[in-house]
Regions:
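Short, contiguous alpha-helical
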Residues: 10-14, 18-21, 29-76, 116-174
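Context-gated lysine
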Residues: 6, 25, 87, 99-100, ...
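Acidic/histidine-rich alpha-helical segments that form the ligand environment
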Residues: 77-117, 127-140
Length: 174
C-alpha cells in the first residue's frame, strides 16, 4: 500500500512543481523584474527555498541551499536577496528541488512518515510536513499564475499529473 501512496504523492507534488516551473518560464521580463516583496522573482524564490528546506532531513540551523542562494528567507526582518535572481537560476534551483523530492520519496518508509519533522516550530510528522510543503508550492504557483493572468492576460494550465508520470513512473496498485 505504501508504494501506491508514494507514487500518488510524488505525481501530485511534481504537478505542483510543474505549475511553478511553467509560471516562471511564462513570466515576461517586465513582470519578472518588478520590485518589492511581491515581486514575481521573489515569490518564486521564496517557494523554492522552503520547498528545499522542508525536504531536508535536518532543521534550518544546518540547512544550506545550493549556491548562489543564501539564507535570507530565515531572517526575521524579511531581508530581500540581492541582486534579484534570474529565471535560469531559479529553474536550476527548481531542478535541484525536484531531485531532492525524488530522493525523499524513494527513501520514504512508514516509520519515517510517522516520525516528527525536524522543525520545532512545525508540530507535525514528516508525512504531514510533506503534504504541507506540497500545498505551499501549489499556493504560490497559483498566486504566480493569477499574477500572470492579471498582468498579461495569460497563464499556465493545471496539470493532472507531474512530470515524473510522463517519464514512466506510474501509479502502482497495491
Amino acid at each position: 500500500m505504501i508504494d501506491f501512496w508514494k507514487s500518488a504523492i510524488r505525481q501530485q507534488f511534481h504537478a505542483a512543481i510543474d505549475m511553478l516551473a511553467n509560471a516562471i518560464k511564462a513570466c515576461p521580463d517586465s513582470v519578472w523584474s518588478a520590485q518589492g516583496q511581491g515581486a514575481f522573482w521573489y515569490l518564486a524564490f521564496h517557494v523554492l527555498f522552503f520547498l528545499d528546506l522542508y525536504l531536508s532531513s535536518e532543521d534550518e540551523s544546518r540547512f544550506r541551499p545550493p549556491p548562489p542562494f543564501g539564507l535570507t528567507e530565515l531572517e526575521p526582518e524579511g531581508v530581500m536577496p540581492e541582486p534579484a535572481y534570474g529565471k535560469d537560476e531559479l529553474l536550476g534551483y527548481l531542478e535541484h528541488c525536484r531531485k531532492k523530492l525524488d530522493a525523499v520519496m524513494s527513501a520514504m518508509t512508514e516509520a519515517w512518515i510517522a516520525d516528527p519533522c525536524p522543525f520545532s516550530y512545525r508540530a507535525m510528522s514528516n508525512g504531514e510536513l510533506l503534504l504541507y510543503n506540497m500545498r505551499h508550492v501549489q499556493h504560490h504557483a497559483a498566486q504566480l499564475n493569477l499574477r500572470l493572468r492579471q498582468t498579461t492576460d495569460s497563464g499556465t494550465a493545471l496539470g493532472v499529473k507531474g512530470r515524473s508520470e510522463r517519464q514512466g513512473l506510474t501509479l502502482m496498485r497495491a
